[in-house]
């Protein structure tokens, strides 16, 4: 199993602020912050959307599994 980076680290590495990322994902910043604090809450559909916005494969981001 390869090492994974946190959801927040993935966002920062993509050069996005919390507000920028939430705008790209069309969700509220509070929801994104909640997911960053508890990535196990992110369902597979949103995992794919986040990985596309952050330009990282889903397998590289830690989603709590």
Predicted regions and their residues:
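Conserved hydrophobic/aromatic packing and binding residues within compact polymer-binding modules
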Residues: 7, 21-22, 32-35, 61
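Short basic helix-loop element that most often maps to the first helix and adjoining turn
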Residues: 5-24, 49
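Recognition helix of helix-turn-helix/homeodomain-like DNA-binding domains
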Residues: 26-42
